[in-house]
Amino acid sequence: MTLPTSSINIINSNTARLSSNLAREGRQVLFSPTETFAGIAEDGFADLGLFPPDAKIAPTSNIQRSDIQAQNPNGGAPIVLASDTTSISITYDIPVLTPDDTVRDLHNGTPSAEITDGPLAGSKISPITPGASIVGRLIILNRREGQNLVRVAWHPRAFLQSNGTGDSQNRDTVQFTATVQAFNYTPGSTLTAYDAQITEYGAIFTVARDKVQTLLDTLAAEALPA
């Protein structure tokens, strides 16, 4: 397809239509509770596991605005001067295909306790807590097939909540909803120069694959609970 010539400067004309842009993307989700949670150290993260092949783990944003209006000096309908943002919500739907015991504890909303005495010794028990959510730090890694760069979403605070169970390929899945929480903190020494790039909802990093572990080690020390 030949595009008409134009004086407009299209900066990505050589790459915008490449078939290599169709590369498939895989995701990894890490979560670190900010309150004591048995089995997960304060600076530790739980890997939520593998997801169904058709899972779309991407943020859904809901932004509510309220218009500020004024009388139209020429008559007719009022004119809109500005719009105030009244509320912001960012959520992820996360179906987990391979939940281990730690992930199932997160799905329960509380760590299980081991029964140490009596005929049930060695068993585990956890409370049923409908609607319970766990506050923590959330990292979502996005890797594209055949690409060196990895996109990493960093949310210093999020609520992780059970959203029941589902089904994929005749296998049960545990469903989570992660809701990002606004949270301000002072970045550590590695990121302090880039404080303006980290909003109360976090930041997105783009790093080479060989620097992913360095970034994760850096984020492990960020936004720790007081």
Regions found by a protein language model. Give the residues of each.
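Extended Gly/Ser/Thr-rich low-complexity repeat segments
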Residues: H107-T116, D195-A203
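Surface-exposed ligand/attachment interfaces on beta-rich extracellular proteins
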Residues: A70-V80, D117-S126, S168, L224-A226
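Beta-strand elements of well-folded, non-transmembrane domains
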Residues: V96-D100, N142-G146, F159-Q161, A182-T186
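Short helix-loop boundary/capping segments
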Residues: N108-F159
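Acidic Ser/Thr/Pro-rich low-complexity disordered segments
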Residues: L3, E35-F45, L141-N148, T190-R209
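Mixed-charge, glycine-accented linear interaction segment located at domain edges/termini
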Residues: W154-A226
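Solvent-exposed edge beta-strands and adjacent loop segments
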Residues: T2-R104, P156-Q175
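Beta-strand secondary-structure signal
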Residues: T91-P95, R137-I140, T177-Q181
